């Protein structure tokens, strides 16, 4: 069972983040948080890690509807989208399916 959907992009890592943010905006989502895992791991535990960013995306209308139906749904908000670069340089975007 796969719990996510993913796509590989043939663009540099930074461009993949920009394209992902633009695509989210087109679908009514705003990026309300951005976690640079590579930078965080380096600064907190002095570990070198590949480019990996978590974008926290939110569609306020959908979030409001969901919260009216189930108050604990906030545990899954915002919707996380990852942009990561593999060790061989491939860039992938993934989100929960």
Model-derived regions: residue spans:
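Compact, glycine-rich, soluble single-domain proteins
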Residues: 30-32, 36-82
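Short glycine-enriched loop/turn motifs at secondary-structure junctions
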Residues: 1-3, 25, 47-50, 86
